[in-house]
């Protein structure tokens, strides 16, 4: 459906961003969220949930490469990976590029998101849903990590912001469950918002994660759609060395994996753990 309307994001009060809507691709209120997918001339197809942009075709690769390749290459030998959320399929797509991984489980609370995105954002999953290693579980993420008997080497929480259905994925109950089902030397990562505008989210996540993990920090990337500066990703493990790998080790692992990335490289990996002083100060308070 062609349209000349403007779509305004409602994440922050007093300022924000807008998108021209060239064509509505899909719009529906699911059991959990109000979902819309539309065409924008600059960014391609855009998906928004509850008034907040989740992903665009133009810049999604930055987010998904950093959420996957940083923990997977830092670990070095992951066999079992858990994705919480990620219904658009792009996180799965990037994880599937690691051929040594044996099992990939994705837990998505909203089956509708998976269905919509497979049809209307096919470039995001790029066929990854058909990978033989993949298993989809429709469940609440908190419930899954606290009930499953499976163990994982890396857990990637591709959560929305801590409002609505995504709120539970920022709780101590969720973090404790993730710690419970991680193997030794396992790594947990999660999106944690744009820290200049959502600093409290980072501080709260750091405080809660520190109850369950010995080494908690953040790494970062600048993603145009998530305006306001750098986006921070929570990092939690019990092995500090995994966050401090030397360039030679990362370069060797990157080469062995045979990855051809558009944003990620070993130098970006190393530099992403350098955080601005205002965030370091907030975390130290």
Curated annotation (Swiss-Prot):
Active site (catalytic residues): 158 (proton acceptor)
One GO cellular component term: cytosol
EC number assigned by the record: 2.5.1.16
Annotated S-methyl-5'-thioadenosine binding sites: 33, 108, 140-141, 165
Pathway in which this enzyme or protein is active: Amine and polyamine biosynthesis; spermidine biosynthesis; spermidine from putrescine: step 1/1
SUPFAM superfamilies according to UniProt: S-adenosyl-L-methionine-dependent methyltransferases (SSF53335)
Principal place of residence: cytoplasm
Cell compartment(s), UniProt: Cytoplasm
InterPro entries in the cross-refs: PABS, PABS_CS, SAM-dependent_MTases_sf, Spermi_synthase, Spermidine_synt_N, Spermidine_synt_N_sf
Superkingdom in the source lineage: Bacteria
Keywords, sorted A to Z: Cytoplasm, Polyamine biosynthesis, Spermidine biosynthesis, Transferase
Pfam families to which the protein is assigned, alphabetical: Spermine_synt_N, Spermine_synth
GO molecular function, a single term: spermidine synthase activity
Residues given in the record as spermidine binding sites: 64, 88, 158-161
Reaction(s) catalysed (UniProt annotation): S-adenosyl 3-(methylsulfanyl)propylamine + putrescine = S-methyl-5'-thioadenosine + spermidine + H(+)
Enzyme class: transferase
UniProt GO BP: spermidine biosynthetic process
Family recorded in the similarity comment: Belongs to the spermidine/spermine synthase family.
UniProt function note: Catalyzes the irreversible transfer of a propylamine group from the amino donor S-adenosylmethioninamine (decarboxy-AdoMet) to putrescine (1,4-diaminobutane) to yield spermidine.
Name under which the protein is recorded: Polyamine aminopropyltransferase
Species of provenance: Erwinia tasmaniensis (strain DSM 17950 / CFBP 7177 / CIP 109463 / NCPPB 4357 / Et1/99)
Gene for this chain: speE
